[in-house]
Curated annotation (Swiss-Prot):
Belongs to the adhesin P1 family. Coiled coil: none annotated. Residues 37-48, 149-160, 174-183 have a biased composition (Polar residues). It comes from the Bacteria. Residues 13-36 have a biased composition (Low complexity). Residues 13-51, 90-183 are annotated as: Disordered. This is Putative adhesin P1-like protein MPN_131. Residues 130-139 have a biased composition (Basic and acidic residues).
Amino acid sequence: MLDYVPWIGNGYRYGNNHRGSNSSTSGVTTQGQSQNASSNEPAPTFSNVGVGLKANVNGTLSGSRTTPNQQGTPWLTLDQANLQLWTGAGWRNDKNGQSDENYTNFASAKGSTNQQGSTTGGSAGNPDSLKQDKADKSGDSVTVAEATSGDNLTNYTNLPPTSPPHPTDRTRCHSPTRTTPSGCSCSCAACWAASRCWSIRVGKMITVSLIPPTKNGLTPN
């Protein structure tokens, strides 16, 4: 989600200014300014943000295709050959040569309020109003093109689904002292499993409580 922070409110790909620099497709200098920006054009404040994002993504994934979420459930992530952010922006320098560090480009990052923007409705700061990009890979090569349909669309609407919590985690909503589970209108497998786990736990609790105490007053396991 952080991938869209630099564009909020301006609709340009590299700017934090009222209009930003849209001429940074040729790369940026070590000072962070666009090489072909005119003297009256604001410097692209976030022109090097891709470096930090790439380091963060690589450090998080560590070459693995999965990473655990807070519940410890494996969460599918993007592989190393296609480290596209789900918001569809790709990397920031717009270079298309594989010899470049961040060679993946993006087809558009311009909101509908921009004169070169999307034909869809919404403001320039709304990620879903940006043109959708489609990322495809062949081996280690990645191509990103503007897309209107397909399975590889990458924007907020097409975010990957989140993994549901383990069914046993759902039993926390039930009190351990209840004798009947609360009614559930859902018949999905996860809810059924949660109800089943609840019944087993309650059954064990009742079974233990019916065992007569031993001579010293303790209930055997």
